[in-house]
């Protein structure tokens, strides 16, 4: 006996619902794949408290990291108004308050929900190193004031501390090579690769109070006190680095002036590094207050000196050489000056900060040969002050010192570090590397991100849009078939 019409329809609907439901289940289980959600962006703030000024740098990186170190980019550079924090010896509280403006500017760029998650650090360099030598109590008061202001700010304040000269040099080296892509590069195949060691670039930094040289030598570093070791992007690095305190631009100028006073004490000081026709009055006392000056003012001199420029580059170089102790390295192969060990130079070098600012003014950043650099600086030093002053309006603050700074840099690089006519082309004078301002701060943040745990990216079950639509359609068909079968069973009268 055959099935009735009602039974045929009921079984057909029931079968359709089963097929549709099974198809939807297969699509749900088979086509689903693991999909990583977009990773969050994290932020970090570093204050560079230098001897002449303080700068804030805001960095950002993805929460997931490449080989244990975050890929960091610069989001903001802000120069704090006023002098360096070491200048606030008579009003320590003002040192902390001076940081507020740049900090508020940085917080505008960070989502409010991440303010408290943003690591913030202040590193003080040679200016505070000198103040700590001169008056440790004043240095502690300034650090306390800075810590109080940043500690109550809506950030994750990690602390304020004195950065060692060796660390300053090493982190500057990291910044240069990160910006140039010589630490890690993103290949055309979509993979992160490590370039060969020969591509690494040395770093030459000069602040107001110290100067640093850092590079990877061709052999072992014999003086381990000049070696810095760290790990980035899954690779280990050992670099030679040394910081020369009191050899920064501002301290060099002060020492140079004191040396001239000591050699010829008189109420009228003729300065060979100042352009001819320049004249000014300087207070004698403050010149001798720096820990870099190891002399006492001659008793016969008045409190104020009249200083007159003579524009004599030969005499200027002779006075600058007196700031170095070259004789301490006689008979030693691996020695720079002042008896400091230095292995042979190797590879390309980036010279930044005051190296760059001075040579940029003198239009010497186009890799000119050493002979051209020397001739250009000497020619500038022999120009009359009135002519130079008229050619560069509004630059009176630094204008008188470019002759001395240029000849000092030339002496330091050529006679101190040992860049010859042949190796001079390996020098590049730069402010940025790969679109990033060069300094120790980015290198520090790159190293710091190695200590910040990477958030594991969230995984979800997901499928393509077409599969999702098909799954919904089959589920709807299954539901319609089940409802239809139920209605047939309940309301269809028997044949």
Curated annotation (Swiss-Prot):
<dbReference type="GO" id="GO:0005524">
    <property type="term" value="F:ATP binding"/>
</dbReference>
<keyword id="KW-0812">Transmembrane</keyword>
<keyword id="KW-0106">Calcium</keyword>
<feature type="glycosylation site" description="N-linked (GlcNAc...) asparagine">
    <location>
        <position position="67"/>
    </location>
</feature>
<feature type="disulfide bond">
    <location>
        <begin position="329"/>
        <end position="335"/>
    </location>
</feature>
<dbReference type="GO" id="GO:0009133">
    <property type="term" value="P:nucleoside diphosphate biosynthetic process"/>
</dbReference>
<keyword id="KW-0067">ATP-binding</keyword>
<feature type="active site" description="Proton acceptor">
    <location>
        <position position="168"/>
    </location>
</feature>
<feature type="disulfide bond">
    <location>
        <begin position="381"/>
        <end position="403"/>
    </location>
</feature>
<feature type="topological domain" description="Cytoplasmic">
    <location>
        <begin position="493"/>
        <end position="495"/>
    </location>
</feature>
<feature type="glycosylation site" description="N-linked (GlcNAc...) asparagine">
    <location>
        <position position="304"/>
    </location>
</feature>
<protein>
    <recommendedName>
        <fullName>Ectonucleoside triphosphate diphosphohydrolase 8</fullName>
        <ecNumber>3.6.1.5</ecNumber>
    </recommendedName>
</protein>
<dbReference type="Pfam" id="PF01150">
    <property type="entry name" value="GDA1_CD39"/>
</dbReference>
<feature type="topological domain" description="Cytoplasmic">
    <location>
        <begin position="1"/>
        <end position="8"/>
    </location>
</feature>
<dbReference type="GO" id="GO:0017111">
    <property type="term" value="F:ribonucleoside triphosphate phosphatase activity"/>
</dbReference>
<feature type="topological domain" description="Extracellular">
    <location>
        <begin position="30"/>
        <end position="471"/>
    </location>
</feature>
<keyword id="KW-1133">Transmembrane helix</keyword>
<dbReference type="GO" id="GO:0004050">
    <property type="term" value="F:apyrase activity"/>
</dbReference>
<feature type="transmembrane region" description="Helical">
    <location>
        <begin position="9"/>
        <end position="29"/>
    </location>
</feature>
<dbReference type="GO" id="GO:0009124">
    <property type="term" value="P:nucleoside monophosphate biosynthetic process"/>
</dbReference>
<feature type="disulfide bond">
    <location>
        <begin position="78"/>
        <end position="102"/>
    </location>
</feature>
<dbReference type="InterPro" id="IPR000407">
    <property type="entry name" value="GDA1_CD39_NTPase"/>
</dbReference>
<dbReference type="GO" id="GO:0005886">
    <property type="term" value="C:plasma membrane"/>
</dbReference>
<keyword id="KW-0479">Metal-binding</keyword>
<keyword id="KW-0378">Hydrolase</keyword>
<keyword id="KW-0472">Membrane</keyword>
<keyword id="KW-0460">Magnesium</keyword>
<dbReference type="GO" id="GO:0046872">
    <property type="term" value="F:metal ion binding"/>
</dbReference>
<dbReference type="GO" id="GO:0009134">
    <property type="term" value="P:nucleoside diphosphate catabolic process"/>
</dbReference>
<keyword id="KW-0547">Nucleotide-binding</keyword>
<keyword id="KW-0325">Glycoprotein</keyword>
<keyword id="KW-1003">Cell membrane</keyword>
<feature type="glycosylation site" description="N-linked (GlcNAc...) asparagine">
    <location>
        <position position="363"/>
    </location>
</feature>
<keyword id="KW-1015">Disulfide bond</keyword>
<feature type="disulfide bond">
    <location>
        <begin position="246"/>
        <end position="292"/>
    </location>
</feature>
<dbReference type="GO" id="GO:0045134">
    <property type="term" value="F:UDP phosphatase activity"/>
</dbReference>
<feature type="transmembrane region" description="Helical">
    <location>
        <begin position="472"/>
        <end position="492"/>
    </location>
</feature>
<dbReference type="GO" id="GO:0004382">
    <property type="term" value="F:GDP phosphatase activity"/>
</dbReference>
<comment type="function">
    <text>Canalicular ectonucleoside NTPDase responsible for the main hepatic NTPDase activity. Ectonucleoside NTPDases catalyze the hydrolysis of gamma- and beta-phosphate residues of nucleotides, playing a central role in concentration of extracellular nucleotides. Has activity toward ATP, ADP, UTP and UDP, but not toward AMP.</text>
</comment>
<comment type="similarity">
    <text>Belongs to the GDA1/CD39 NTPase family.</text>
</comment>
């Amino acid at each position: 006996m055959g099935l009735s019409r009602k039974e045929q329809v009921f079984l057909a609907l029931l079968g359709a619902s089963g097929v549709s439901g099974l198809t939807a289940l297969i699509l749900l289980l088979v086509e689903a794949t693991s999909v990583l959600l977009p990773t969050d962006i994290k932020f970090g703030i570093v204050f560079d408290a230098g001897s002449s000024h303080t700068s804030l740098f805001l960095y950002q990186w993805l929460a997931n990291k490449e080989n244990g170190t975050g890929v960091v980019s610069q989001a903001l550079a802000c120069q704090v108004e006023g002098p360096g924090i070491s200048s606030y010896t008579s009003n320590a509280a003002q040192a902390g308050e001076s940081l507020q403006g740049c900090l508020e500017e940085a917080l505008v760029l960070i989502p409010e929900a991440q303010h408290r998650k943003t690591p913030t650090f202040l590193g003080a360099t040679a200016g505070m190193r000198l103040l700590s030598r001169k008056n440790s109590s004043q240095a502690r008061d300034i650090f306390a004031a800075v810590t109080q202001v940043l500690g109550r700010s809506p950030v994750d304040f990690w602390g304020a501390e004195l950065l060692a000269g060796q660390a300053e040099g090493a982190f500057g080296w990291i910044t240069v090579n990160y910006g140039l892509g010589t630490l890690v590069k993103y290949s055309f195949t979509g993979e992160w690769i490590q370039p060969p060691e020969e591509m690494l670039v040395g770093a030459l930094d000069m602040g107001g109070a110290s100067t640093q040289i850092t590079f990877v030598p061709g052999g072992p570093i014999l003086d381990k006190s000049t070696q810095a070791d760290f790990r980035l992007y899954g690779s280990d690095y050992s670099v030679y680095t040394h910081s020369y305190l009191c050899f920064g631009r501002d301290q060099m100028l002060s020492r140079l002036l004191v040396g001239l006073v000591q050699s010829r004490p008189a109420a009228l000081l003729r300065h060979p590094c100042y352009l001819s026709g320049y004249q000014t009055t300087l207070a004698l006392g403050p010149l001798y207050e720096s820990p870099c000056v190891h002399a006492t003012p001659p008793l016969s001199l008045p409190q104020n000196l009249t200083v007159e420029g003579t524009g004599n580059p030969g005499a200027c170089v002779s006075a600058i050489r007196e700031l170095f102790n070259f004789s301490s390295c006689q008979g030693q192969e691996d020695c720079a000056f002042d008896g400091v060990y230095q292995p042979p130079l190797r590879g390309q070098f980036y010279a930044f900060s005051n190296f760059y600012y001075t040579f940029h003014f003198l239009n010497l950043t186009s890799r000119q040969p050493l002979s051209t650099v020397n001739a250009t600086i000497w020619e500038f030093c022999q120009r009359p002050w009135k002519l130079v002053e008229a050619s560069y309006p509004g630059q009176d603050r630094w204008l008188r010192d470019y002759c001395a700074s240029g000849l000092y840099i030339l002496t330091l690089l050529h006679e101190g570090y040992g860049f010859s006519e042949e190796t001079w082309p390996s020098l590049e004078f730069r402010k940025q590397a790969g679109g990033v301002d060069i300094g120790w701060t980015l290198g520090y943040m790159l190293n710091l991100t190695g200590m910040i745990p990477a958030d594991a990216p969230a995984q979800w079950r997901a499928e393509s849009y077409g599969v999702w639509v098909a799954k919904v359609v089959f589920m709807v068909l299954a539901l319609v078939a089940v409802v239809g079968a139920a209605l047939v069973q309940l309301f269809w009268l028997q044949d």
